[in-house]
């Protein structure tokens, strides 16, 4: 008998559950939890990538870091080691680079430096990611509202994170659908 191929064009409940599970319990290390001692380039890249493991397209390479240093987005390493402040900046960059230009990322950094410390800015970023990600991934039914009096930096941060996390969600959905499609030829072959 002839068996037709089934191609998934929408997500079934199991796929939705797997995508939602990506967001369950997600958290970023706070500024005080980032290594206080400098890290070499490979260690820096490994640490940043470990924070976003499981999210396709959210990754950093050594050449990207070198490019960000060359363009002045982050400062030069001291004795080839990257500081806590640079790690925090790279964690922000790796998430936002898919939705903002480097020029706009630099502008946001300048705005934040004018109003708060690197630790405060980074911890606000972490809080906002952890607020938005579960909601967008369907693991939470609510999201904290922005204060109506929130400054421009907070509004721009929220907008950046909502856009970036929506892109992460879409990438996870499409990966799940492709994985499902890849299973069908083997399953159908077993039925013959």
Predicted regions and their residues:
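Basic helix-turn-helix/winged-helix DNA-binding cores
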Residues: 3-113
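Intrinsically disordered, low-complexity, charge-dense segments enriched in Lys/Arg
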Residues: 111, 115-192
């Amino acid at each position: 008998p002839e068996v037709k191929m089934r191609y998934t064009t929408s997500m079934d409940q199991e796929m939705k559950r797997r995508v939602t599970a990506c967001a369950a319990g997600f958290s970023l290390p706070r500024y005080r939890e980032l290594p206080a001692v400098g890290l070499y380039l490979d260690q820096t890249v490994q640490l940043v990538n470990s924070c976003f493991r499981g999210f396709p397209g959210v990754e950093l390479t050594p050449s990207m870091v070198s490019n960000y240093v060359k363009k002045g987005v982050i400062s030069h390493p001291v004795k080839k080691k990257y500081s806590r402040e640079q790690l925090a900046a790279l964690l922000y960059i790796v998430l936002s680079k898919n939705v903002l230009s480097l020029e706009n990322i630099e502008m946001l950094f300048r705005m934040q430096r004018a109003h708060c410390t690197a630790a405060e800015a980074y911890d606000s970023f972490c809080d906002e990611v952890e607020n938005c990600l579960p909601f967008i991934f369907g693991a939470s039914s609510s999201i904290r509202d922005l204060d109506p009096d929130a400054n421009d930096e907070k509004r721009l941060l929220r907008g950046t994170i909502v856009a970036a996390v929506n892109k992460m969600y879409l990438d996870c959905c499409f990966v799940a659908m492709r994985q499902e499609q890849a299973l069908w030829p083997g399953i159908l072959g077993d039925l013959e």
